[in-house]
Amino acid sequence: SGGFDFSFLPQPPQEKAGVGLGPGPMGLMGPRGPPGASGAPGPQGFQGPAGEPGEPGQTGPAGARGPAGPPGKAGPGKPGRPGERGVVGPQGARGFPGTPGLPGFKGIRGGQTGARGLPGERGRVGAPGPAGARGSDGSVGPVGPAGPIGSAGPPGFPGAPGPKGELGPVGNTGPGPAGPRGEQGLPGVSGPVGPPGNPGANGLTGAKGAAGLPGVAGAPGLPGPRGIPGPVGASGATGARGLVGEPGPAGSKGESGGKGEPGSAGPQGPPGSSGEEGKRGPNGGSTGPTGPPGLRGGPGSRGLPGADGRAGVIGPAGARGASGPAGVRGPSGDTGRPGEPGLMGARGLPGSPGNVGPAGKEGPAGLPGIDGRPGPIGPAGARGEAGNIGFPGPKGPAGDPGKGAPGPDGNNGAQGPPGLQGVQGGKGTTGEAGKPGERGPGEFGLPGPAGPRGERGPPGESGAVGPSGAIGSRGPSGPPGPDGNKGEPGVVGAPGTAGPAGSGGPGERGAAGIPGGKGEKGETGLRGEVGTTGRDGARGAPGAVGAPGPAGATGDRGEAGAAGPAGPAGPRGSPGERGEVGPAGPNGFAGPAGAAGQPGAKGERGTKGPKGENGIVGPTGPVGSAGPAGPNGPAGPAGSRGDGGPPGVTGFPGAAGRTGPPGPSGITGPPGPPGAAGKEGLRGPRGDQGPVGRTGETGAGGPPGFTGEKGPSGEPGTAGPPGTAGPQGLLGAPGILGLPGSRGERGLPGVAGAVGEPGPLGIGPPGARGPSGAGKHGNRGEPGPVGSVGPVGALGPRGPSGPQGIRGDKGEPGEKGPRGLPGLGLPGLAGQHGDQGPGPVGPAGPRGPAGPSGPPGKDGRTGHPGAVGPAGIRGSQGSQGPSGPPGPPGPPGPPGASGGGYDFGYEGDFYRA
């Protein structure tokens, strides 16, 4: 009886003599015992066959780019006003995409991923044109017309990257419609990582600000851009030369422009080397009395940098004072401190995609990493095909009738084959841009080498000194007058006392520029290799016991299996309500007697009366408390099965048992027909902002294109046979920058071609991209019946890839599958950083060491235009000297302190100026 105490049942009357009365009627069924221990795990099942590969997507065509036009000719001119600032050269053509890789043949455990395609050659970025010669006072020479766009030459094989070309002439970017966006192509065969592309060309250096008034060296420099005017002091020493940005070619000398908006003040530097004579600016207040000519002073010591003050509002210009005699030229002061790096220029047009590196070999499985923060939930993938039905297991032992407490959790079943990959979900909404970073102390780019120093003009005659007039009330600023002739330097006056330093400081932040148009969407990167399956994580704490579900329908009674070992007896439950007596079953055979239980306390023996007639059986007395259970006797032969009694009262649910070790996988059956697609899931929350990537090199900025109208969808074209890969084409000239077209409608899916025998992996030069089919994407066909799975054949040579089927409509997302084990993939190769957008091109910083590979970034948002620099000081009127030959480029300046600029975020990319 399984170790249960049946002493509470009515016992047959005991005979005084040792004569048995034979087997009595069957007793009532006792209460349900505790659940037995879990059985040993079953044997491991066989791996099921792999599912059929999905249909490949269709590749759209890439437009060919024409060759570059001939350079425009610069107009001749006498020395004089500067030429127009050159437009930044067009962006180099995008390299041809690599040949698509043939999808790997999926073996029993998922075949190896096909190797990636050879990378297209990276287009070269157009370099800025050389600086124009110094123009005359006459008009600017006309810019030559752009040459005609040549037709594209026949494609050639990719050559090794050539040497960095000379700075080419500047072309104009013209508008033009963009071609339709191609469909996503098959992943290409991965080639080796190409050499890094040439850095983007530096922008032209702006016109040089005029130098400060010459003074005796050694006194503190003039403050940077004007703050609130302090009391007028004697002329200070020359202010520190502004740091020159990363050198482009030397710009032509700019004419004195109108007064610019005040820029943010940089920290006051120590006196710089004396600059070339600048044009004289308006005097703030009347000049002090002229001192006697001073002796040539020695070099002054470096002053401490002044604290940054906020830029003051510019007051109206004061009346112009009389010119004092020019002093003797003092010795050069110490070199000023480097300025702070400037704001990042606006983002350029997207560059061509970088070369895809070769697929790495699978590394050893790493230790499981710390759980990352959950990313955004993507759209649910399409529902995978139903797994195979496992073989039926042996029938379990017949359960006791009645509703017992729930048993322990069963072992996890074998994991089914992975479902088909779901269609990619729509693009997430753009997150909010990150708030601007803390403002750094300065607003200039890293210093580059100084441009060539201009020649000094012949000295002019010194004007007579007039008496100091009374300080008039300050009138409003008049319009800037015409450029005066350059005066000859006069004799240096005696050093005046240094006026108090004005409170410099950063100016108000300029208004944010209009963000440029959205860059073109980068090519979709190749899918990384499947990472090795991670180990199981630590078991979580058991969850709370759920409310018991409704009782299921009673299943058919299984055949009795072999009895498992008896579990330890649980605590004695309270006896259930007594059920009604069922009909007596047929008498079973008496088993061998069990060990006798402990006898109850013997009652007192009554006096033996005369044996009377058998009287009426009295009512059964109350059940005595049960003695402890004796050890189980050996089991007797099984009696015939009695009918089940009525179900007992449902007990309380037991605590959840611990999950046993997972059993081996069962044999995977053939895949069932695919289920219906589920409904589209809700879009998940936006993921956390990723870490800041390192700033890419500044690209040449073109104007942003406008988004074109969405074109009508075409009818689906039939897939053509795959073309042979053509030789790598020569880089065509940059075409006219088109307006990006909108994405076409999806077409009907084509019939998937039969999977060919996989051929050997060819490494051909990438072919040219064919024209896109005009078709509309069709609806997905009904899945055919699933055939029986044949034995896995030997891996044959790889055949040519079949024609690409048309991409089907996005199916309804399937239900979310069970959570997989965490993968341990190798870190992906870094995606090519997008070029930066239009805006003033800042100087390129020195190239830092390569950081760790990050995930491919999305295109960043167009940066804000940089702040307008301060206007130069107006020079005195003098005659113009002849232009001298350009001097050699100066040495590069020391690197500036790292400034904090704005942070721009766009769709997960983060740029720091």
UniProtKB/Swiss-Prot annotation:
<feature type="modified residue" description="4-hydroxyproline">
    <location>
        <position position="338"/>
    </location>
</feature>
<feature type="modified residue" description="4-hydroxyproline">
    <location>
        <position position="41"/>
    </location>
</feature>
<dbReference type="GO" id="GO:0030020">
    <property type="term" value="F:extracellular matrix structural constituent conferring tensile strength"/>
</dbReference>
<feature type="compositionally biased region" description="Low complexity">
    <location>
        <begin position="581"/>
        <end position="601"/>
    </location>
</feature>
<feature type="compositionally biased region" description="Basic and acidic residues">
    <location>
        <begin position="602"/>
        <end position="611"/>
    </location>
</feature>
<feature type="compositionally biased region" description="Low complexity">
    <location>
        <begin position="408"/>
        <end position="421"/>
    </location>
</feature>
<feature type="compositionally biased region" description="Low complexity">
    <location>
        <begin position="748"/>
        <end position="758"/>
    </location>
</feature>
<dbReference type="GO" id="GO:0031012">
    <property type="term" value="C:extracellular matrix"/>
</dbReference>
<feature type="compositionally biased region" description="Gly residues">
    <location>
        <begin position="422"/>
        <end position="431"/>
    </location>
</feature>
<feature type="compositionally biased region" description="Gly residues">
    <location>
        <begin position="696"/>
        <end position="705"/>
    </location>
</feature>
<dbReference type="InterPro" id="IPR050149">
    <property type="entry name" value="Collagen_superfamily"/>
</dbReference>
<feature type="modified residue" description="4-hydroxyproline">
    <location>
        <position position="341"/>
    </location>
</feature>
<feature type="compositionally biased region" description="Gly residues">
    <location>
        <begin position="281"/>
        <end position="303"/>
    </location>
</feature>
<feature type="compositionally biased region" description="Gly residues">
    <location>
        <begin position="759"/>
        <end position="776"/>
    </location>
</feature>
<feature type="modified residue" description="4-hydroxyproline">
    <location>
        <position position="10"/>
    </location>
</feature>
<keyword id="KW-0272">Extracellular matrix</keyword>
<keyword id="KW-0964">Secreted</keyword>
<comment type="subunit">
    <text>Trimers of one alpha 2(I) and two alpha 1(I) chains. Interacts (via C-terminus) with TMEM131 (via PapD-L domain); the interaction is direct and is involved in assembly and TRAPPIII ER-to-Golgi transport complex-dependent secretion of collagen.</text>
</comment>
<keyword id="KW-0379">Hydroxylation</keyword>
<feature type="compositionally biased region" description="Low complexity">
    <location>
        <begin position="125"/>
        <end position="154"/>
    </location>
</feature>
<dbReference type="Pfam" id="PF01391">
    <property type="entry name" value="Collagen"/>
</dbReference>
<feature type="modified residue" description="4-hydroxyproline">
    <location>
        <position position="35"/>
    </location>
</feature>
<feature type="compositionally biased region" description="Low complexity">
    <location>
        <begin position="367"/>
        <end position="386"/>
    </location>
</feature>
<feature type="modified residue" description="4-hydroxyproline">
    <location>
        <position position="13"/>
    </location>
</feature>
<feature type="compositionally biased region" description="Low complexity">
    <location>
        <begin position="619"/>
        <end position="629"/>
    </location>
</feature>
<feature type="compositionally biased region" description="Low complexity">
    <location>
        <begin position="199"/>
        <end position="220"/>
    </location>
</feature>
<feature type="compositionally biased region" description="Low complexity">
    <location>
        <begin position="782"/>
        <end position="797"/>
    </location>
</feature>
<feature type="compositionally biased region" description="Gly residues">
    <location>
        <begin position="254"/>
        <end position="263"/>
    </location>
</feature>
<comment type="function">
    <text>Type I collagen is a member of group I collagen (fibrillar forming collagen).</text>
</comment>
<feature type="compositionally biased region" description="Pro residues">
    <location>
        <begin position="883"/>
        <end position="895"/>
    </location>
</feature>
<dbReference type="InterPro" id="IPR008160">
    <property type="entry name" value="Collagen"/>
</dbReference>
<feature type="region of interest" description="Disordered">
    <location>
        <begin position="1"/>
        <end position="913"/>
    </location>
</feature>
<protein>
    <recommendedName>
        <fullName>Collagen alpha-2(I) chain</fullName>
    </recommendedName>
</protein>
<feature type="compositionally biased region" description="Low complexity">
    <location>
        <begin position="650"/>
        <end position="659"/>
    </location>
</feature>
<feature type="compositionally biased region" description="Low complexity">
    <location>
        <begin position="316"/>
        <end position="332"/>
    </location>
</feature>
<dbReference type="GO" id="GO:0030198">
    <property type="term" value="P:extracellular matrix organization"/>
</dbReference>
<feature type="compositionally biased region" description="Gly residues">
    <location>
        <begin position="499"/>
        <end position="517"/>
    </location>
</feature>
<feature type="compositionally biased region" description="Low complexity">
    <location>
        <begin position="488"/>
        <end position="498"/>
    </location>
</feature>
<feature type="compositionally biased region" description="Low complexity">
    <location>
        <begin position="527"/>
        <end position="574"/>
    </location>
</feature>
<feature type="compositionally biased region" description="Low complexity">
    <location>
        <begin position="459"/>
        <end position="476"/>
    </location>
</feature>
<feature type="compositionally biased region" description="Low complexity">
    <location>
        <begin position="264"/>
        <end position="274"/>
    </location>
</feature>
<feature type="compositionally biased region" description="Low complexity">
    <location>
        <begin position="28"/>
        <end position="67"/>
    </location>
</feature>
